[in-house]
């Protein structure tokens, strides 16, 4: 039986698509995209949001019944990320955090050393930690061993739209993981989303692919459909790849000479 719900820690979600909020031109556009996506969990960069609701973003998520997932976007050290997560816990009354510790502004790739340090401290402090990490199976396993509730490997660098540049590594992460694997970053279009699920990911997190699309709401709907299609295809079991062609139906028809039926 296909397990339709996504389980992270002690919570279940009907949608396997997690949305980000960065890049939207305005809140009205963001609202249309969020509704079209069907998401139930959406990241919020705590350093860019007025926790009192001044930006309207938190109010919007509340109206839509979407759970905000604070993240530590922009942090460059473990100490900075831990402090940001603690502030988010106080402001939003949640111990869930998407952990980001970025090495530099040009690549926006995770700093593996600082990421693990931050994860260890936050887990010890009672957080449900979802770390944005490189597509490195060893690092993903290390983060799981620290007690992270999921691992979130990148498909390609944030905002590039390059899709999944190392699918084999994603498959290795999935094969070794004992926690949900959420592909995070680099998605460009719906086919990338479907591939992520076919590779074995439990969920997908994206923002730019939707918020900067020509029609964000339409792209959000496409991403939602692609995530569902990719997940169902994986559960259904694809046929094995073959070098040579194979007829879908055996050849059983026999031929006979004209007039055979009449006995002539």
From Swiss-Prot:
Keywords: Cytoplasm, Schiff base, Thiamine biosynthesis, Transferase. Pathway: Cofactor biosynthesis; thiamine diphosphate biosynthesis. Coiled coil: none annotated. The keyword Cytoplasm applies. GO terms for biological process: thiamine diphosphate biosynthetic process. One of its GO terms (cellular component) is cytoplasm. It is an enzyme of class 2 (transferase). Catalyzes the rearrangement of 1-deoxy-D-xylulose 5-phosphate (DXP) to produce the thiazole phosphate moiety of thiamine. Sulfur is provided by the thiocarboxylate moiety of the carrier protein ThiS. In vitro, sulfur can be provided by H(2)S. It is found in: Cytoplasm. Homotetramer. Forms heterodimers with either ThiH or ThiS. One of its GO terms (molecular function) is thiazole synthase activity. InterPro entries: Aldolase_TIM, Thiazole_synthase_ThiG, ThiG. 1-deoxy-D-xylulose 5-phosphate binds at residues 159, 185-186, 207-208. The active site is at residue 98. Belongs to the ThiG family. It catalyses: [ThiS sulfur-carrier protein]-C-terminal-Gly-aminoethanethioate + 2-iminoacetate + 1-deoxy-D-xylulose 5-phosphate = [ThiS sulfur-carrier protein]-C-terminal Gly-Gly + 2-[(2R,5Z)-2-carboxy-4-methylthiazol-5(2H)-ylidene]ethyl phosphate + 2 H2O + H(+). HAMAP family: ThiG. The gene is thiG. Its EC number is 2.8.1.10. This is Thiazole synthase.
């Amino acid at each position: 039986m296909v397990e339709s719900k996504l389980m992270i820690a002690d919570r279940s979600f009907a949608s396997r698509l997690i949305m980000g909020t960065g890049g939207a031109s305005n809140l009205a556009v963001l609202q249309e995209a969020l509704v079209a996506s069907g998401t139930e969990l959406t990241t919020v960069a705590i350093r860019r949001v007025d926790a009192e609701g001044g930006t309207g973003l938190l109010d919007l998520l509340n109206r839509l019944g979407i759970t905000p997932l604070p993240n530590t976007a922009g942090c460059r050290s473990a100490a900075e990320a831990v402090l940001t997560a603690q502030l988010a816990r106080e402001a939003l009354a949640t111990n869930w955090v998407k952990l980001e510790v970025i090495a530099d502004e040009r690549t926006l790739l995770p700093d593996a050393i600082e990421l693990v340090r931050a994860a260890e401290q936050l887990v010890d402090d009672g957080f449900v930690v979802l770390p944005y990490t490189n597509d490195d199976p060893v690092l993903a396993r290390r983060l799981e061993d620290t007690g992270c509730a999921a691992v979130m490997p990148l498909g390609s660098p944030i905002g590039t739209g390059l899709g999944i540049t190392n699918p084999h590594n994603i498959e290795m992460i999935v094969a070794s993981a004992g926690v949900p694997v959420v592909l995070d970053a680099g998605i460009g279009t719906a086919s990338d989303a479907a591939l992520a699920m076919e590779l074995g990911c439990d969920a997908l997190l994206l923002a730019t692919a939707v918020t900067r699309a020509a029609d964000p709401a339409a792209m959000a709907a496409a991403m939602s459909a692609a995530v569902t299609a990719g997940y169902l295809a994986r559960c259904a079991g694809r046929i094995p790849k073959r070098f040579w062609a194979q007829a879908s139906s055996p050849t059983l028809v026999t031929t006979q000479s004209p007039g055979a039926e009449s006995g002539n």
